[in-house]
């Protein structure tokens, strides 16, 4: 997630065009023409031995002759010269380079050359980039684009050209327009980090085909989406499309899971993409999901209603006060309701009056105005009057307004006026609703990600025992474990299983059944038959010895006939579970080539297709994330909300999914887990049949996960000066209530020292940002006192690293009544050790000159203390490398 060199790429002060030309069909000509036409106000240096000047600009014969080192170079020559030219640019000290084309055979050499010279690369096979706020058009596109607040990042030149052409027709602006190409060096995660902090960018749109590093993408996207809406269109949903794009894109539901986990929103096609661009460019952030619809015809309003219903949207309910004001203002034949049909004879004045009344109310969160071509209210005239009314209304900034001027030719000018006025406008009622629901879903995603997770009850795990069992099985050469072998592993994580016995033949099966009691179930054991149902390999409700013997022999006979070469490892014998009113579910964990382990929930079946029959999540899961997965399964009808007799216990199933997640996170030896069926009966969840694929694992356990899990290994018990022992551990999302209680025990003076302002209270969003952190980017250690089953926070220290992992900003806060126990120092020592081990170079912070305790502590810990009395601050800097040496 490095930001090194991005400033030189996205805000260059000078640009060299290598291979500049005066021949109109050459890349060097097109690049020079676009750079000069774009209004770039820095030096543009054409490099070519063939021309003395290019488009009136003095040319230089080679890179060595350049009068100074350019920030950015663009290679427009034959691809065979790429490596030699890049080497020359590196020796010159150039910081960034755009490579327009390069064969795959060059990629490794180009990457190595760039690394050697500390140079950043965009591309190869990149269309280039446009930065309208800098007057920069370093691309092949002749299309000029306006300045705007939307940034677009694309992995496809074709899609980039399409969006540029579409945006030009609608006079839509961008802050940045970046075509990544093959992402040999600079990738989407680094650009997300940059754009998240860019003041000219208020929203981001991504077109993606593949990812080089899923974890970096999820981390960067999650961080950026907390402040700016990000929409994604992802191609390659089908295997055929993946082959066409020549990508290993992974399971499409895994993309959905990652996008949702990061707080982004996915659009499904180019039609939605265009609507999304319009929405992100002009729409205000939503306050809620209640929609009010105004129309001058029933049919367009009905189309909007149908679309809203299909998206599970929510209509606003008007208050009686608002209804009465509308009755007084509108003709008597207008029925006051939502949608509000002003009828086809409605004038522009009726629209404006209605808008004024509605904007004064607080009955809705977004207002959709539909206009069908009408002689009573001409499209352009009504648009102009509506724009003026919105511009001068004192409450217009509190409402998200969407306009839908139907028709093509007659409404074209009206839509142009809306775009100029910064109001989102759409061609159809359905497209308008789709755009609205995009923002509703984005808001819901962000709200869900900030909810405080519930604490699971009776959550147990014995990682050491599970590891031992897995290692023993691997040492014995096992690659797959059956139900009876998996049982102790699941039980180590608190999951219920049915007691299971192995019978080698029908006689032994009868003997076991007699011992455990009837009724029983028999299940075939064969590594060669993937689905037992193919040979009726599961027999249930066997109530006598004769039934058991006959069933066992029948299973063996069917295998010999249908699968004569199959190996038979006997039978599993289980007591029959109570299936009365129970529901059968399936939980599967599989490894995705892009996102690593995935947790899938569905109802199963012989020909199980997770893309169609399951909902998917990325581990690790907490109770909130698990509950969202269950609810998503119910809403999408992948699982039923109830069995014949009782509703599904959502909380209980969520807890089981958390247990599965913990098992997968802790045990990298697990390649695949299949619990099928999982019997849900009231609050009881029992794994009846389980298979587990395993393999030796070496390396970093966390690296295989798309989201970094809670690092248990950093927990530490510490003894304070008064002899009390407390636990130092990483902060958790579940800590929000305890953190709020901790802050209430800190004096106003100490809070002022910490936050440099008077803090009356912290909102839920503030506390969520403090507790729901990305351990890849931020670390917060809390000192907790454990009393019985409760925890009490005594102190907090925190470090937030920059994307380059060089500097981190730190802070520390201790409960005011616990000073003098050495707690602050021990927390700081813990943080210093962590940041140093994490590869950071410097730890920085600021405090106030009169915070003598913090200043003294910083000096003792080796910080450089810079007292700046004029600024009223004290700068604190610790060189972590020097401290380690000392």
Give the residues covered by each predicted segment.
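Short beta-strand element of the conserved SAM-dependent methyltransferase core
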Residues: 522, 573, 692, 783, ...
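Catalytic-core regions of core metabolic enzymes
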Residues: 1-689, 697
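Long, contiguous binding/interaction regions
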Residues: 697-886
